[in-house]
């Protein structure tokens, strides 16, 4: 078995001896510094690979202070204010933290700002308002009792990630780091030359770990230093008059701040992206990837590898976009908080290797009294392990303060187990693919392939009550035996690919993930009806196909056999009876967890079967539609049992229930992954208790296993 390699450990100046001890104990072959730590000089000659975290946009306050016009900027929108007369004054920085943000008074407000009457949606003419710089207020000529907002540019005078780390770690004497805009001419030339000098001065560094390139995801703090707005996918801080003038020339139309602030929603992933915002993302991808390639080329010219951290200043790189591979990166590394976020990294193409930074991060917010770093490591690994078996990372690692991890009783033992299992997976798979079903599963939403494994997320692996019942679908799929595609509605209009067996639509009504007005396009609904009628499968979760139109809320209510009562059809009686006896629930002994669920779902039609109900309303319904099948879930949070239910639902919807038992384990807390080329089978226990399970291949009992808590057992494929 592999005893060394595939592991990166953090280090710092005060833990040299401990770094070497753990490097040898865990078999690490790479060392890294982190934000707030430094690579010890004593380790520069160690044979391990050395990663250096490199910041293109910060850690040079002297440059930022000397060039205030090229500090990074963000579009902000003021709070809504109601006019009670014909004049209204709005204080722009109300609710924002003035140590992080500063109003841009260098560029013409009448050119780059926008005042909007939010009652009518009309733009207030520029001669009807003015900016009073001494007070920081905008005075507006108003219509009484109309609401108004001001969209404006602000300088980011404290890097958001540095601010987050500063507050999280309670740093006291660390200067606030300004963030400068590498896209602008003076700074771009300076940063390129600075990178060359850095490469020359650091010959012992093997890997330049860009953290990241040029634009931070939107991370805005309020006036009490709390997070005010966080959008891991947000483009609001990727703007400046310089960039926007270039965009106008590229796009052929005038830019508006509303394209970014989006009524105050800031184009979160949940919003159906407008044409203008899609254009902006396309433009930013082209420009960011082109400049990133220039930075990578500099690194390569010094014989070093270039690695990108998928996070922080990653905006514009879009790893699943059509320009990412042109950057020429050697590797991508990202934070792994779940199976979904692991697949977000491991499925990236166009790099030589991928690396996952496992949780917990070695920061005091976890390694403290009342914290449970061992429990977090176990939970994180059980989710990550499922996904690795399907789409493996090449490497794993950790970040933060090593001494916190080293001093926590039992934590290093837990890491030793994780690293050992990770190496076992690679040893047994030997670079081959795991078995998958003979059809593909497609996730349908407005983002499609640009945002693979990113659906229904508010922030990176952060729990939200409003989303966990939908996020569970992707989390389950991340470790399942299916090739998963991500398609958008234009893909449906162009023709559903022949290799897709099941389409899944999951999300809340009118979000980008459900689809909103796309569902009143006859080309979309007729294409999917035809697909299912001819034998395809459709699975809906939450409010799939939802858009009130022509007497229906779910536009494919005929396909799914369900609709949602919106109050309009209460006078129509519904007679729904539950019958839980079905292939989908054959393994299930306990009640199904639908999470927050979706209320007022009723079955309708002639070919449905209700498998679970909440009072008179339905939670799990199957339906026959021509030669095809559909399944509706009111919600589906991640759990081992729900993974089994979804597995069965997909095979049922595809019309191939017998195929599910090609490789099969009986206990719902266990799963099986098969590598046909190496004839090795992994059976994993996803529970914290001992579990017994039977392994079947093509209907034949191969083995009866008793698995320890969280165990992964390897057996030979006897087929």
Where are these regions (language model features)?
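Polysaccharide-binding and catalytic clefts of secreted carbohydrate-active enzymes
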Residues: 68-326, 344
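Short, well-ordered secondary-structure micro-motifs within conserved domains or adaptor modules
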Residues: 328-334, 495-517
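A glycine-rich, often tryptophan-bearing local segment used as a flexible ligand/cofactor-contacting loop or short
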Residues: 515-591, 596-598
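Extracellular ligand-binding/catalytic regions of CAZymes and related secreted enzymes
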Residues: 219-222, 403-435, 552-555, 559-570, ...
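Short helix-loop-beta junction
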Residues: 461-486
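Noncatalytic N-terminal accessory/assembly modules of large enzymes
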Residues: 2-58, 65-97
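Hydrophobic targeting/anchoring helices
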Residues: 26, 62-64, 195-196, 209-213, ...
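Catalytic domains of carbohydrate-active enzymes, especially glycoside hydrolases
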Residues: 8, 13-49, 195-209, 331-332, ...
